[in-house]
């Protein structure tokens, strides 16, 4: 039987996740200079989905944990926030919510040199901001599950 995760372990997982944010943000920046229209959006969506799966796995927020956590009314809003945006549709809604910033990143990259630099910086910033928000949501859900004596199995490993 699984034991409750110690708060120190959850904080260590969160710090480990923060260290990996840079990798995803750099990939987002590199994708920002992708010259093929439409492909950059698909790559950004795939990158977000991969990052979310990695972060959830580290906190032990698997599909089995999701089913278990959805039975607790106090956790349902946070469970929806963590799991419902972790779909292609959820990521597309998120990218659209960036609206003007995402459109600006997409169009400015066609300006030689300077535009590509601006697009890369915007891609880095957007991915970094999103990743940090998602880590906090996963951390909060794992802490709330712990506070309510709900056991989940944290893998505490990186998904390649």
PLM regions and their residue ranges:
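C-terminal helical "lid" subdomain and adjoining coupling/linker elements of P-loop NTPases
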Residues: 39-40
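Terminal, membrane-proximal amphipathic helices
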Residues: 1-33, 45-160
């Amino acid at each position: 039987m699984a034991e409750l995760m110690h708060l120190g372990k959850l904080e260590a997982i969160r710090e480990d996740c923060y260290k990996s944010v840079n990798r995803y943000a750099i990939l987002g920046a590199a994708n920002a200079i992708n010259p093929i229209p439409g492909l950059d959006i698909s790559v950004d969506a795939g990158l977000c989905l991969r990052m979310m799966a990695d972060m959830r796995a580290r906190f032990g927020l698997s599909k089995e944990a999701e089913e278990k956590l959805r039975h607790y009314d106090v956790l349902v809003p946070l469970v929806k926030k963590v799991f419902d945006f972790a779909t292609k549709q959820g990521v597309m809604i998120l990218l659209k919510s960036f609206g003007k910033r995402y459109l600006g990143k997409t169009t400015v990259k066609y300006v030689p040199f300077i535009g590509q630099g601006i697009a890369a910086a915007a891609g880095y910033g957007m991915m970094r901001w999103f990743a940090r928000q998602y880590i906090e949501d996963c951390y909060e859900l794992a802490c709330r599950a712990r506070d309510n004596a709900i056991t989940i199995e944290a893998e505490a490993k990186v998904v390649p």
